[in-house]
Amino acid sequence: MQEERRLAVLRAIVEDYVATEEPVGSKALVERHGLGVSPATVRNDMAALEDEGYITQPHTSAGRVPTDKGYRLFVDRLTTIKPMSTAEKRAIATILDGAIDLDDVVQRSVRLLAQLTRQVAVVQYPTLSRSTVRHIELVALTPTRLLVVLILSTGRVEQRLVDLAAELGEEDLADLRTVVNRAALGEIIADAATALRALVPAEDATPTGAVVDVLVEAMSDHRSDERIAVGGAANLARFGDSFDSAVRPLLEALEEHVVLLKLLGEATAGEILTVRIGHEGPYQELSSTSVVATGYGPGDEALARLGIVGPTRMDYAGSMAAVRAVARYVSRILDEG
């Protein structure tokens, strides 16, 4: 009973501190939250929470604020992630359903996450090396020039032009299209490239060799594996009182995409929604920063990560709900192709 009451007091302190940005006192807790006990009892509970390291007193005359340990207990004891409202779900669907390609999906997702959470949003582009081949299309632009289109399971589309040494008729083009699709369809990139290379001898000058060369080249392009989109940096203006401790280091991190990728990578394991709070992260200089992140991708496979980063004083419940909802919706879009 006592433990549950103290947890309720901690929950109230976290919610009030996030909402008001002010240290929280016992009188305010009793007035706002109807805890059913006297201010004296709440003060005793707050003293116990402080002794255990869950809250701290920033100034002698001030109320209490949560510590990283307090935020962690708060997050761990969230029995359910509150669902998005109907209006929020409708907004997510409206914004993301209008995307025309993978780049558009990523850019819309990062803007949406930043708006929903009022934090900095980070979305990693799907990793090419873990993609599978969905389709290969060959389009004759002229009898000696082809447009080769590689479509991956992530929704990524690669296009290459191929100039042929000799003319290629419609029937031969259809046969070639069948051959390359039979070799690569459904395979992960590395296996697809190997299968395609096996179709022709080295330095083959035939149309098949020319098409295989550009397909393998497209499959070897790993530039997108470390591409990320960032949005919502202006949201950090809300935390001006924490500029030196939280905002400045985070602004500097936004310039280093490798740092952001590591933050997302440290926070996520597959499609599990995870939270890293303050000192739990990999960078000491970002010890006042929290990360809420998860993986996304078609089916049950997480090909990339998305999430939000911000000062530890954040709405964890709301941020977790938004990150999970956007990831699920983006995954569905990629799954549907």
Curated annotation (Swiss-Prot):
One of its GO terms (molecular function) is DNA-binding transcription factor activity. InterPro entries: DeoR_HTH (IPR001034), GAF-like_dom_sf (IPR029016), HrcA (IPR002571), HrcA_C (IPR021153), WH-like_DNA-bd_sf (IPR036388), WH_DNA-bd_sf (IPR036390), WHTH_transcript_rep_HrcA_IDD (IPR023120). Keywords: Repressor, Stress response, Transcription, Transcription regulation. GO terms for biological process: negative regulation of DNA-templated transcription. The keyword Transcription applies. Negative regulator of class I heat shock genes (grpE-dnaK-dnaJ and groELS operons). Prevents heat-shock induction of these operons. Belongs to the HrcA family. This is Heat-inducible transcription repressor HrcA. It comes from Nocardioides sp. (strain ATCC BAA-499 / JS614). The gene is hrcA.
